[in-house]
Amino acid sequence: MKATGIVVEYNPFHNGHKLHLNKARELTQADVVIAVMSGSFVQRGEPAILPKWERTRMALAAGVDMVVELPVSFATQHATIFAEEAVRILDAIHVDTLFFGSEHGVAEDFTLAAKKVVDNEARFDEAIQLALVDKKTSYARAYTEAFKKLFGQNLLDITKPNNILGFHYALAAQKQNPSISLQTIPREHAGYHDEEANHDQIASATAIRKLILAGKLEESSHYLPASSIAILRNYEGPFLSWTDYWSFLQYRLIQAGSEELEGIRGVSEGIQNRMQQAATKAQNFSDFIELTKTKRYSNARLQRTALQILLNARSQTSSPYIRILGMNKTGQQYLSLHKKNISLPIITTVSKAPAGLLEEELRATNIYTLAKGLENYQAGDFHIPPILTL
């Protein structure tokens, strides 16, 4: 069976995702499409708008054959680690092709850029450090400056959000298994972070979340496939944002000592002190970010750091594993054919997982379900089995 892998958040699953999924299957001639999906919290450092099990249902209803959870310790980090670990899982599960959307739209250029970085790794790392020192800027900007300086302006624009992820997928594939084929299609209509829905059928997930959180579910339905609309209408829980977790973060920052927070993943350069001061003044999470931000810390980095503090995520990360959130019959058939040759632990029943392997994931789910209205999902990792569809 020819397998294509995609890396997703489906926050929520919308028409753009449906287009991407259909193209992945069509252009790669895949027998099975496997999605590695973020769980309770996503890469921008915020809670998913609805639980991972509902988003898994959306994925399966739209045609994904298997949904594998990207562990929270990787799903909530910067693009390098996010991509490395997603590719590690897809490689372990033996996909032939990694398919992604990008602003650039030419897969060969991503591969070429990745090869150049791998072949010039020492020079590239040195250029990043020089940019950090000389310009006192964020790591992301220093990375971009170093890339432009060494490889020119025209190879690949890694200031674009989907190009960044695509580049890091390509880089991870070069380092882990260069035989993985890369394919990409240009993103259509909506930009990744566009906050307004300006097209008849395609809008960014950001714009769709904005509509849903404003109570405009029916208006958002223009941008969602019928299967997603049905799941959203039947969902009885709340639609979530940082608003639902601000008081928990505020308490955590106020009660913790500065030295205690130094050991949290992503905390550096004394940023915890600014965060603790802001926590006593801010009225909400948006205020908190405004009071905390500096030239060296982008909003996304601040959100990720705040999330690691909320989750009490220590500097070490968990070991990778393959945790199945859901499958259809094709996905089940594929897993049955390949499971003996998969090197990572395969988890379908959480209670049978190796001791300690899921500790961070379980804690993240428990914190996520503290939000009012999620009582039915509490301890869901134990009582909600993988979703199996016909």
Curated annotation (Swiss-Prot):
It is an enzyme of class 6 (ligase). The keyword Phosphoprotein does not apply. Its EC number is 6.3.4.-. GO terms for molecular function: ATP binding; ligase activity, forming carbon-nitrogen bonds; tRNA binding. GO terms for cellular component: cytoplasm. ATP binds at residues 7-20, 101, 162, 187. Gene3D superfamilies: HUPs. It is found in: Cytoplasm. It catalyses: cytidine(34) in elongator tRNA(Met) + acetate + ATP = N(4)-acetylcytidine(34) in elongator tRNA(Met) + AMP + diphosphate. GO terms for biological process: tRNA modification. Keywords: ATP-binding, Cytoplasm, Ligase, Nucleotide-binding, RNA-binding, tRNA processing, tRNA-binding. Catalyzes the formation of N(4)-acetylcytidine (ac(4)C) at the wobble position of elongator tRNA(Met), using acetate and ATP as substrates. First activates an acetate ion to form acetyladenylate (Ac-AMP) and then transfers the acetyl group to tRNA to form ac(4)C34. Belongs to the TmcAL family. PANTHER family: TRNA(MET) CYTIDINE ACETATE LIGASE. HAMAP family: TmcAL (MF_01539). This is tRNA(Met) cytidine acetate ligase. The gene is tmcAL.
